[in-house]
């Protein structure tokens, strides 16, 4: 009888040990993912993007020794109301640390998918440059609304704040060492600082609080080949989609 009890106790102890190790591994990977993103997100907010001319980023053997690198920043909002096309507006900017110049484009898109048809992409690009932290069109823009949107545009990196990133809990963690790829997703509330900032700047047609997705590929410790992006998903189903995406990373300059 005593032997049976001892075996039962031993079995329960082993079960708890396995559960603890598994949970610990999951928590460890979540912490790694957060730490990987924190390297960049801790810089937010970057109110003056020209500060990036003097900001170092992750470098590996993909960089020429004389290349300081180019920061690529991209922010976009996508909204699809029921029965309508997916409408996207955003800006991509390349901030060259070698030439201390920045250029890119503001873009709009309407993606329509009719039954049994391939999605139709209608992207328009409006070339821009950045001078004194302001965006200026380098070609004539006839649409007055687009002119204003370019002049008033702010990248997410300029107004967001992730000081509480390490406090996010109960994330849905995914890690594939073969690719490698990784992600962590968190349910936010409408009281979250960054959610408030997005609602302040965009007409978001839902009161639902978004999920925050931290997603990347490449080495968790750093890679110029992979990518990292963050996404706020307010609504996602067959007929309606509302999401905001942002990315900021340093990559080798094109002319080096």
Swiss-Prot record:
PROSITE patterns: PROKAR_LIPOPROTEIN. It is found in: Cell membrane. A lipid is attached at residue 25 (S-diacylglycerol cysteine). Keywords: Cell membrane, Lipoprotein, Membrane, Palmitate, Signal. A lipid is attached at residue 25 (N-palmitoyl cysteine). The keyword Signal applies. One of its GO terms (cellular component) is plasma membrane. Residues 1-24 form the signal peptide. It is a lipid-anchor. Belongs to the staphylococcal tandem lipoprotein family. NCBIfam families: SA_tandem_lipo. This is Uncharacterized lipoprotein SAOUHSC_00053. It comes from Staphylococcus aureus (strain NCTC 8325 / PS 47).
């Amino acid at each position: 009888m005593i032997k049976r009890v001892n075996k039962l106790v031993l079995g329960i102890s082993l079960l708890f040990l396995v559960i603890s190790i598994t949970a610990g591994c999951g928590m460890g990977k979540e912490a790694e993912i957060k730490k990987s993103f924190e390297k960049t997100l801790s810089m937010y907010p970057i109110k003056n993007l020209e500060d990036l001319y003097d900001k170092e980023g992750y470098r590996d053997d993909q960089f020429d020794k004389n290349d300081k690198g180019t920061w690529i920043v991209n922010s976009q909002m996508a909204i699809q109301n029921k029965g309508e096309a997916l409408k996207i507006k955003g800006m991509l900017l390349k901030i060259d640390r070698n030439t201390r110049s920045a250029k890119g484009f503001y873009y709009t898109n309407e993606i329509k998918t009719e039954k049994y048809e391939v999605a139709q992409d209608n992207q328009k690009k409006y070339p821009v440059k950045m001078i004194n932290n302001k965006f200026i069109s380098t070609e004539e823009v006839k649409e007055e609304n687009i002119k204003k949107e370019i002049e008033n545009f702010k990248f997410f990196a300029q107004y967001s704040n992730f000081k509480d990133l390490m406090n996010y809990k109960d994330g849905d963690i995914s890690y594939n060492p073969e690719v490698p790829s990784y992600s962590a997703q968190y349910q936010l509330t409408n009281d979250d600082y960054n959610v408030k900032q997005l609602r302040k700047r965009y007409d978001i047609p839902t009161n639902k609080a978004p999920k925050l997705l931290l997603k990347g590929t490449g080495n968790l410790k750093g890679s110029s080949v992979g990518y990292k992006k963050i996404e706020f998903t307010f609504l996602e189903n067959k007929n309606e989609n509302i999401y905001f995406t942002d990315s900021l990373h340093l990559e080798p300059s094109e002319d080096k």
